[in-house]
Amino acid sequence: MIMKTYFSGVSTLGVHSLATEDYGFFPLSVDQKTMERMKNVLDIPATQLNISNSSLIGSLCVGNSNGLLVPDITTEKEVELIKMFLKENSLDVNLERLKAKNTAFGNLILTNNKGCIISEELSRFRKTIEDVLDVESGVGNYAELATVGSNGVATDKGCLVHPLTDELELEWIQNILRVDYVERGTANRGVTSVGACILANSKGAVVGGDTSGPEILKIEEALDLID
């Protein structure tokens, strides 16, 4: 199932939210009706919060069913809210505050429950990232971009990446994430940073409201969401 929506008129949903196979985080500005629809499409419990007093949840955080990485600038109150949410939903998730110069973990890491791709900019933290997310990783960039997280969206079934990703990079991504499908595509009528525009897991996807019909078809194919 795929849903189109905006967050307060903004279509870059992946910048402001995080979705995994088992939980989701959304900005405080999202109305309850939209929240419930997204939870239904993705079939996950979710809560609304800030990270580092910011709505840029998807840019700053990265997570899967095993772990969640947040920047060291995340406040104590925000960490406690996350812990409470995880406990209330009986989710056994490793929560790690990582101190790094570049705090945009969501932009620099692409992960599912089988593997993760780490930007060269975070290569020194590879062991910590692997331990928290409990997956093996590959370090590198693709499409000549360091922002491997914001330029891709991955689930346990498939992955959609920047349209300039080459064939060797597609094979590399597929091997690391251990998915059946890796496709190139766009969202929001030509935006190449697909991770900034899409929230997805193996059960559904929520895409920016500007996403076209042909783009939705490609997203469905890449993430194996066609019924």
Curated annotation (Swiss-Prot):
Biological process per Gene Ontology, one example term: cytosolic ribosome assembly
The molecular function terms of the Gene Ontology recorded here are:
ribosome binding; translation initiation factor activity
Look up keyword Protein biosynthesis and say if it applies.
Answer: yes
Protein biosynthesis: present as a keyword of the record? yes
UniProt keywords (A-Z) are:
Initiation factor, Protein biosynthesis
What Pfam families has UniProt attached to this entry?
eIF-6
* Origin superkingdom: Archaea
State what this protein does: Binds to the 50S ribosomal subunit and prevents its association with the 30S ribosomal subunit to form the 70S initiation complex.
Family per record: Belongs to the eIF-6 family.
* Protein's name according to its UniProt entry: Translation initiation factor 6
Tell me which species this is from.
Methanococcus maripaludis (strain C6 / ATCC BAA-1332)
State the encoding gene.
eif6
